[in-house]
């Protein structure tokens, strides 16, 4: 799950480095571009093209704040995964995502998932919320970052997420 911000900070050389990194990742390992994109439809279309066509990533993280039309250009790539930020692992997530916004996001993403390629980003720092979100989202994949340095505990997270759904971490 390469975080694009570290590559973008290096300018053109960073994009060249990103391409080199992608080439050494084994073909059987999915590449999730941790980009957290979210923009108007036309801009999102260009971001989707760059990450899913040009760079050939298998999935991408996106921000739902601008609504469905900012996510559709990504989800229209039906063979690619799109992980929508729902309840993130950073400490500031409580500023907006709690107590209720994350539930609204889960509901909307479930409604928008017409191609079956949407999933949610749900931080491991909130294991007590995972089953609550699952009741709303249904059986879609979750990307669960935040184990380790950010404070999420693997055992608590796995226990909370246990429902038979394959969960990429």
Regions found by a protein language model. Give the residues of each.
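Residue-level signal for short, function-critical loop segments
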Residues: 6, 88, 124
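A C-terminal functional module that forms or caps the active site or interfaces directly
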Residues: 124-168
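Conserved anion-binding
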Residues: 35, 39-121, 139
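Alpha-helical scaffolding segments of alpha/beta enzyme cores, especially the outer helices
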Residues: 16-27, 46, 50, 73, ...
